[in-house]
């Protein structure tokens, strides 16, 4: 469909509506295909299927980048003229996505942009795996299990000391947090749950931060925040920092 769309004859200032309608239809099909794959990669109980879905995600993201780094497609949309306000907004959003993917960059920078996006996708997947597939178990004494139904307790494994071992799967975590009587045990479980994967993921975050900084440099921006905020309401990091300072000034006295 993209190949056919790329060959669409368009003159300067051509009506945007029919072109945008074709584009929207293509990406509706694209999302129908890619959406379930993303779901499988995150929630399917079969580890092999999750891995296969992750491999597909990488290829899908590479294909997506190829589309939005294609100058022919970019110029096709750019040569249209929209009169309807909704079409104007949609057209500009599409053009911005092309530009944010580096369609206007010189070839070497465009290739580096694609490599960065690929690496960020892989880091994101590894980060999610470290949270989702975390094998760590917490140890709870029989006394700390007070309040939980016997059917729940009977399904748990014990260690040599006779204490119960609980992981981070929701069928284990949620009942404990909702029903266990021991406040300290619930607090310990909650802290461990929110910190799962932290040791490995801090390293991944550092890599992602470095890649995002390099990405911003490709576009001549001082930081990733400068780059990502340019199309958002705040526009600049200074505006965000000023807003946060005002919020802190307002709420800080209320915490005392």
Where do the model's predicted regions map?
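Zn2+-dependent metallopeptidase catalytic domains
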Residues: 1-256
């Amino acid at each position: 469909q993209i190949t056919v769309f790329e060959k669409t004859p368009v003159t300067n200032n051509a009506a945007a509506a029919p072109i945008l309608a074709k584009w929207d239809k293509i990406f509706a099909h694209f999302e129908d295909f890619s959406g379930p794959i993303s779901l499988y990669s995150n929630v399917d109980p079969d580890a092999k299927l999750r891995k296969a879905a992750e491999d597909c995600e990488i290829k899908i993201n590479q294909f997506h980048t190829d589309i939005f780094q294609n100058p022919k497609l970019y110029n096709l949309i750019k040569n249209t003229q929209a009169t309807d306000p909704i079409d104007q907004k949609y057209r500009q959003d599409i053009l911005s996505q092309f530009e944010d993917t580096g369609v206007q960059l010189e070839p070497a920078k465009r290739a580096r942009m694609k490599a960065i996006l690929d690496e960020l996708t892989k880091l994101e997947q590894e980060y999610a795996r470290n949270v989702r597939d975390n094998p760590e178990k917490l140890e709870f004494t029989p006394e700390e299990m007070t309040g939980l139904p016997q059917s729940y307790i009977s399904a748990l494994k014990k260690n040599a000391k006779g204490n119960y071992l609980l992981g981070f799967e929701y069928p284990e975590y949620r009942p404990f947090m909702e029903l266990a009587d021991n406040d300290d045990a619930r607090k310990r479980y909650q802290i461990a749950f929110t910190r799962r994967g932290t040791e490995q993921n801090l390293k991944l975050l550092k890599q992602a931060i470095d890649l995002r900084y390099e990405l911003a440099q490709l576009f001549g921006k001082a930081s990733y925040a400068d780059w990502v905020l340019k199309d958002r309401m705040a526009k600049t990091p200074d505006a965000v920092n000023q807003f946060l300072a005002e919020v802190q000034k307002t709420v800080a006295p209320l915490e005392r």
